[in-house]
Amino acid sequence: MSFRFGQHLIKPSVVFLKTELSFALVNRKPVVPGHVLVCPLRPVERFRDMSPEEVADLFQAAQRVGTVVEKHFQGTSLTFSMQDGPEAGQTVKHVHVHILPRKAGDFHRNDSIYDALEKHDREDKDSPALWRSEEEMAAEAAALRVYFQ
């Protein structure tokens, strides 16, 4: 069964957590090692359109996933980010939370991560040549999936 993520169909091999209302997947073009996404299962474009149950499930999943990726990728902190609407930088019309494990000195200016996320998400900069291989993404998802079994 594939997962819908906006205009994209996501293969189960890159999904490492599925809850009642959410799923988590590895990123095809991570900003930092361990940069992953958590999304509601229902394809909902804006945060305001989610039900209270979906919001609770999404953020409980994000908390669990954050704990795992911080540990697995030897981070010391986390950045959680959501762009909600086109003016906020949302390019995939499906609510999603970016979770990025952080380390001291990973960016010269700490807030530069937001510039990197903005560039990362721009469709005009999104070439398949920049994506990781399906095999690499599946291997990362398999390693993360172990934490949730």
Curated annotation (Swiss-Prot):
GO molecular function terms noted in the UniProt entry: adenosine 5'-monophosphoramidase activity; adenylylsulfatase activity; adenylylsulfate-ammonia adenylyltransferase activity; bis(5'-adenosyl)-triphosphatase activity; nucleotide binding; ubiquitin protein ligase binding
GO biological process, one term: intrinsic apoptotic signaling pathway by p53 class mediator
Motif Histidine triad motif: positions: 94-98
Record has Iron-sulfur as a keyword: no
CDD domains assigned to the protein according to its UniProt record, in alphabetical order: FHIT
Source taxon at top rank: Eukaryota
Protein biosynthesis is among the record's keywords: no
Biological role stated in the UniProt entry: Possesses dinucleoside triphosphate hydrolase activity. Cleaves P(1)-P(3)-bis(5'-adenosyl) triphosphate (Ap3A) to yield AMP and ADP. Can also hydrolyze P(1)-P(4)-bis(5'-adenosyl) tetraphosphate (Ap4A), but has extremely low activity with ATP. Exhibits adenylylsulfatase activity, hydrolyzing adenosine 5'-phosphosulfate to yield AMP and sulfate. Exhibits adenosine 5'-monophosphoramidase activity, hydrolyzing purine nucleotide phosphoramidates with a single phosphate group such as adenosine 5'monophosphoramidate (AMP-NH2) to yield AMP and NH2.
Name of the protein in its database record: Bis(5'-adenosyl)-triphosphatase
Species of the source: Bos taurus (Bovine)
